[in-house]
């Protein structure tokens, strides 16, 4: 986006902006719940009043992932009553087994979003499919399928923080400056990175414990084989509480990270957003969360603000009600896919026709490629494996094979001799979201062949390790047989509503004052590391500007 677009946004913002007094006037929506006598340590402390048809709210946040959680916290701290609309459920009620989430080895309906079968990235082992039939339910992990890729996303209060491995990685500064040149990197690295790390509860594993525990034998084996081929490895921070994990290993607390839990949620240990940012927002007494509601339309309202249409669904995904509410300001935080699809649809259908032509562009899969190697029997990986990754192979500085590869667990409960890696490659390929008038849906133009550049980069690294070790790839993990590379999915969707192109330099949609984008759709397709910390930090930076310039 040019400076002129930003200046135009500043000029028009005053015409249609809503004053802070008007924002505060909407407090009636949450008045019954503001005077809470005590606060729990999770977002379940937020009032769960369901939005009613015809309600008016000062600030509506679509989604409760990283960007949405930051927006909710900073708005409520500024005194603004804020309503989050979340498509998934609130994961705060145990099932019949006494647990909120199910484990990976024995998944049930809680595992997947409105699916009849689990859909794990490692789908096969030694010729056998390992996905299992389940009852259809609003489970925690979604694998949304497009023609060339499936995208894993978290569903529920806390978004992707509920289902990821928690690796809290800071991107290389020179690469951050390359992909987001309009953002002051000094400010980001000196102010917003530390703030986000604190807010997310980032911590580091005790390296002495790491070296001795059986639970990280897989990571030590992955490190050893990488280093023998001349590659650099690095410890990586995480939001899983490693002191809790030590107690798990000692048998003092219930196992989660050591109990086969991660992609379908952790019952303990992980500092997901419902326990950090969202819990802090709830503690202000000004946050309300409406769950099991899916936003389908946003358009200017008569007079001022925006009309937001949403569908209420039941736990089997059936639409049980349609509602229209009015919001003075709307913050899009439905994730790279959700926000991009919604805005592309709104532009194409004439509800927000003046959105930039850049909306929908610049989507990428963060270069995600998964691969497994078959180690020799003397390089075992262990029958006991923590589900929380703590180490990666850092080859980003190599221009011929720039990758950062997470040494991933394969917690099967038995010795597999498999080293598994989730590689983030510097794949330059991008795609766009586009409206399909024939189906009325939004398509993604990504083709599976666009992963070939990423495969080529990863292959240079892992071919070298295999050659040095005298080992081979596992070809039975991502299909029945003869499929080496997991190249048909991503855990790290990024882009679609790029910062300073589709928005101004702070996530405003300048053609529509009062509309903001605060999630991973702002990041142009690849950040070189696990992206959630970057998304959080960018949201912190943007919300500082939005609150100081547009609201207060």
Swiss-Prot record:
GO molecular function, one term: flavin adenine dinucleotide binding
Cofactor(s) the protein requires to work: FAD
Pfam families in the record: GMC_oxred_C (PF05199), GMC_oxred_C_1st (PF22500), GMC_oxred_N (PF00732)
Alphabetical keyword list: Cholesterol metabolism, FAD, Flavoprotein, Isomerase, Lipid metabolism, Oxidoreductase, Secreted, Signal, Steroid metabolism, Sterol metabolism
Reactions this protein catalyses: cholesterol + O2 = cholest-5-en-3-one + H2O2; cholest-5-en-3-one = cholest-4-en-3-one
UniProt-listed Enzyme Commission number(s): 1.1.3.6, 5.3.3.1
Top-level taxon of the source organism: Bacteria
Role according to the record: Bifunctional enzyme that catalyzes the oxidation and isomerization of cholesterol to cholestenone (cholest-4-en-3-one), an initial step in the cholesterol degradation process.
Protein name: Cholesterol oxidase
Organism: Brevibacterium sterolicum
């Amino acid at each position: 986006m040019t400076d002129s677009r930003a200046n135009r946004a500043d000029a028009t913002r005053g015409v249609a902006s809503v004053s802070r007094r008007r924002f505060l006037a909407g407090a009636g929506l949450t008045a019954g719940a503001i005077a809470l006598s005590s606060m729990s340590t999770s977002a379940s402390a937020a009032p769960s009043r369901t939005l009613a048809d015809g309600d008016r709210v000062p600030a509506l946040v679509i989604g409760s992932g990283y960007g949405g959680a930051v927006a909710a916290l900073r708005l409520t701290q500024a005194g603004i009553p804020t309503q989050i609309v979340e498509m998934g459920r609130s994961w705060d009620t145990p099932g019949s087994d006494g647990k909120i989430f199910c484990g990976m080895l024995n998944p049930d309906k809680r595992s997947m979003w409105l699916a009849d079968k689990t859909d794990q990235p490692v789908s096969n082992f030694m010729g056998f499919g390992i996905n299992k039939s389940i009852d259809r339910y609003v489970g925690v992990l979604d694998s949304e399928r497009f023609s060339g890729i499936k995208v894993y996303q978290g569903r529920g209060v806390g978004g992707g923080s509920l289902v990821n491995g928690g690796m809290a990685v800071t991107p290389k500064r020179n690469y951050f400056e390359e992909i987001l040149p309009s953002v002051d990197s000094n400010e980001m690295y000196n102010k917003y990175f530390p703030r986000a790390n604190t807010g997310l509860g980032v911590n580091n594993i005790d390296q002495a414990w790491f070296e001795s525990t059986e639970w990280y034998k897989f990571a030590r084996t992955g490190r050893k084989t990488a280093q023998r081929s001349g590659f650099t490895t690095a410890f990586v921070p995480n939001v899983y509480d490693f002191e809790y994990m030590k107690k798990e290993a000692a048998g003092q607390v219930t196992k989660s990270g050591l109990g086969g839990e991660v992609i379908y949620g952790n019952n303990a240990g992980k500092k997901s957003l419902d326990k950090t940012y969202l819990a802090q927002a709830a503690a202000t007494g000004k946050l309300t969360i409406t769950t099991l509601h899916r936003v389908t339309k946003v358009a200017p309202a008569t007079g001022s603000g925006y009309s937001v249409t949403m569908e209420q669904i039941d736990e089997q995904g059936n639409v049980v009600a349609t509602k229209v509410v009015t919001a003075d300001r709307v913050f899009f935080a439905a994730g790279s896919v959700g926000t991009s699809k919604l805005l592309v649809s709104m532009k194409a259908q004439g509800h927000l026709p003046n959105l930039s032509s850049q909306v929908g562009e610049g989507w990428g899969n963060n270069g995600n490629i998964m691969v497994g190697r078959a180690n020799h029997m003397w390089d075992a990986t262990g029958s006991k494996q923590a589900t929380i990754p703590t180490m990666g192979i850092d080859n980003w500085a190599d221009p011929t094979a720039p990758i950062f590869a997470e040494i991933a667990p394969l917690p099967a409960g038995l010795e597999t001799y498999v080293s598994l890696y989730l590689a983030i490659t510097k794949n330059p390929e991008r795609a766009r979201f586009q409206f399909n008038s024939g189906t009325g849906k939004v398509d993604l133009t990504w083709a599976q062949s666009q992963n070939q550049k990423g495969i080529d980069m990863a292959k240079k690294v892992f071919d070298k390790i295999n050659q040095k070790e005298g080992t081979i790839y596992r070809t039975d993990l991502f299909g029945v047989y003869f499929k080496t590379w997991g190249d048909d999915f991503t855990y790290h969707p990024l882009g679609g509503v790029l910062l300073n192109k589709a928005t101004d330099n702070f996530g405003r949609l300048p053609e529509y004052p009062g509309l903001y984008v605060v999630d991973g759709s702002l990041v142009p397709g690849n950040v070189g590391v696990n992206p959630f910390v970057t998304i959080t930090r960018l949201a912190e930076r943007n919300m500082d500007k939005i609150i100081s310039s547009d609201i207060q």
